[in-house]
Each structure stands twice: as structure tokens, then as C-alpha cells.
Design a protein with these regions (language model features):
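Short, positively charged, Ser/Thr-rich terminal linear motifs in low-complexity/disordered regions
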Residues: 270-320
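Generic beta-sheet signal
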Residues: 34, 54, 113, 142-144, ...
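Short, charged, surface-exposed secondary-structure boundary motifs
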Residues: 60-67, 121-123, 145, 150-151, ...
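Class I S-adenosyl-L-methionine
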Residues: 1-14, 19-116, 212, 220, ...
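Short hydrophobic/aromatic-enriched beta-strand-loop microsegments
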Residues: 49-56, 107-111, 130-137, 185-194
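A contiguous loop/helix-start segment that scaffolds small-molecule binding in enzyme catalytic cores
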Residues: 2-4, 77-82, 95, 138, ...
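Catalytic cores of RNA-modifying enzymes
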Residues: 99-100, 104-127, 131-140
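Phosphate- and divalent-cation-binding pockets in alpha/beta enzyme and binding domains
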Residues: 40-41, 120-121, 176-177
Length: 320
């Protein structure tokens, strides 16, 4: 039976993959993965599977999210086991909701396999308990960026001294973050920790406080910022110690990346997005027509995702 799996790759260490994720990767026919999935995790994929990089690097996308959605629907008609592999957990800032909606519209069977999200990996690396009955009774997972890349800090009204804040994808917005947190009433000496490439060999950790966020530059991506009284410095202080971390190392990692480039099949660039979108609409109409035909409560005898490539520019030849 054809099936799509939305799999969380975790922070990058293959030992942190779930047993179920390892099993599915080992049986995959095709894997559509994000740019941040590490080579070590990709090595867990079956040798017979196709690897397609559909991620983005430094804001440059191979495919838009709409094109990825349509491509996912397309390959679901061609392969038995399709894996959409996402860094961290698919359901936390992984755009899984849009892909779930696209698959549901055309009746594709899918399953979600959770992964360890970056906030948990970063907290473990920095030895920070995100909750502590003495200091923090709630945790807020958020991001500094909106859809389209613009900076958004409209969540700061929810910050209290009893809140641990985990900021995904802070990018270069540390100065804005520091200023906004101070204006929201947070103590300037509230400790912070930034973890870059959490759970990977190139992992870097640095401590500062809210007042010191404005000084941060050249930090490698991916990074995660944790703010709150639960944060403890490894040197027993929350004083800014960034000079001890040799920021030039972070800058070098930002250039080389936290992962080595892989030799992928560059075919994701060759597909016509209009073809994917037309295919998705066609399959959606077929699925709705089939459901009307069989009536409520009856299961369709044939899978609605029967290969349609002959109607769309001989997609099997293009895919091969």
C-alpha cells in the first residue's frame, strides 16, 4: 500500500532518531529531505532509495512550499514508501500542516513520525531544564521570523519571569530580540544560552544575558536561543562570556555549514511546478468524484492515487 511518512530527523545525531524512524528510512523508496538533515542521518536511508533535497540554504529555496506540496503528491503516486524527512520534529516550525493538508485533499494515506525538536536538543546540550518548579512553570516555543522572512516579535506580551523562552531561527535578530525583551519588562540580567548545531559534532554553546544579546554577531545557523531563569552558565555565571567562545569559529561554521554538501539528484529543479499543481488538482477531483460514487461509509475499491503520469507529460520518464 502506498504511503507517505512525515518523519522527524531530530537534531542531527543518528542515535537520537526513533526506532520507528530508522525502520522507515531503511525501507524508503524515495526521501524528500530538508537542507538541515545531516549526512549521518541520511546514511540511515536505504541504499536503493532516491534522495531529493528540497530544502533551503541561507534563504535560497530549491522549491517553494507549494511546489513541495505538489511534488509530494506527485511522488506518492509513483512509489510505495515515500518519506518527507524534516530536521527536528515535523510538527514544530516544520510546515507539516501545509503538507498534511495537501495530502489529505487528494486522499493520500500518510503517517507522522515525531522527532526530537531543536529546543529539547539545545536544552540537553546546555544542561538546562526548561521547566523548574523554583523558576519556570511554562515554556514558550516561538520564532523571530514570519512567513516571508520578516522579523516578528509580537509574542513578547506573553513573556513573564516564570516563562522559559525558546526562540527558533533567531537569525540575525539578536539585537531586536534583546531590545524587545527589555521593553517588555524582562530583567536585563535574565540569563540566556545560544546553541548552534545542537546535537552535532560542530555544536557550539554560549551564555549571555538579555542585555548582552545586542552584542551577538556572526553566529552559525542553525541556532536556538533559550531565555529564562532556568539557564545556568557552565562557568557558574550569567556574565557575557562570548569572547571566550571565539566567535570567529562561529563565523567559519556559518560559511562552511554544519553539514557537508551531499551529491543529490538535482531533479527537483527540473520539474515544472505548474505540472505538479495541475496533477494535485486533477487527483483531488478524482478523489472527490470517487467518494461521491461509492457513497458515504463505503471504502473505495481502488486507491485514488493510481499513477497519472501519462496524462501529465509522461511524468514517469521525467522522474527517472
Amino acid at each position: 500500500m502506498r504511503k507517505v511518512y512525515l518523519v522527524g530527523a531530530g537534531p542531527g545525531d543518528p542515535e537520537l532518531l526513533t526506532a520507528k524512524a530508522v525502520r522507515i528510512l531503511s525501507s524508503a523508496d524515495i526521501v524528500l529531505h530538508d537542507a538541515l538533515v545531516t549526512p549521518e542521518v541520511l546514511n540511515m536511508v536505504s541504499p536503493k532509495a532516491r534522495l531529493i533535497d528540497v530544502g533551503k540554504r541561507c534563504g535560497h529555496k530549491l522549491l517553494t512550499q507549494d511546489e513541495i506540496n505538489a511534488y509530494l503528491v506527485h511522488v506518492a503516486a509513483l512509489y510505495e514508501v515515500v518519506v518527507r524527512l524534516k530536521s527536528g520534529d515535523p510538527l514544530i516550525f516544520g510546515r507539516a500542516g501545509e503538507e498534511i493538508e495537501a495530502l489529505s485533499k487528494v486522499g493520500v494515506e500518510f503517517e507522522i513520525v515525531p522527532g526530537i525538536t531543536s529546543a529539547l536538543a539545545a536544552a540537553a546540550a546546555a544542561r538546562v531544564s526548561l521547566t523548574d518548579r523554583r523558576f519556570a512553570s511554562q515554556v514558550l516555543f516561538t520564532t523571530a521570523h514570519r512567513r516571508g522572512g520578516s522579523i516578528s516579535l509580537d509574542w513578547t506580551h506573553a513573556i513573564t519571569p516564570e516563562t522559559t523562552l525558546a526562540v527558533y531561527m533567531p537569525g540575525s535578530a539578536y539585537a531586536e530580540l534583546g531590545s524587545t525583551l527589555l521593553s517588555s519588562g524582562l530583567d536585563p540580567q535574565t540569563p540566556c544560552v545560544i546553541v548552534a548545531c545542537a546535537g552535532q559534532k560542530s555544536q557550539q554553546i554560549g551564555w549571555t544575558d538579555v542585555a548582552g544579546l545586542a552584542k551577538l554577531t556572526g553566529i552559525a545557523a542553525p541556532a536556538l536561543l533559550i531565555v529564562g531563569r532556568v539557564v545556568r552558565s557552565e562557568v557558574g555565571s550569567t556574565v557575557d562570556i562570548w569572547k571566550q567562545l571565539q566567535v570567529n569559529v562561529w563565523q567559519e561554521q556559518q560559511i562552511t555549514g554544519c553539514r557537508k554538501d551531499l551529491k543529490h539528484e538535482p531533479r527537483a529543479k527540473q520539474y515544472d511546478p505548474a505540472t505538479f499543481q495541475a496533477l494535485a488538482r486533477h487527483l483531488g477531483r478524482r478523489h472527490r468524484a470517487r467518494r461521491r460514487a461509492v457513497g458515504a461509509g463505503r471504502r473505495a475499491e481502488a486507491h485514488p492515487m493510481v499513477s497519472q503520469e501519462t496524462r501529465f507529460r509522461d511524468s514517469r520518464r521525467r522522474d527517472g
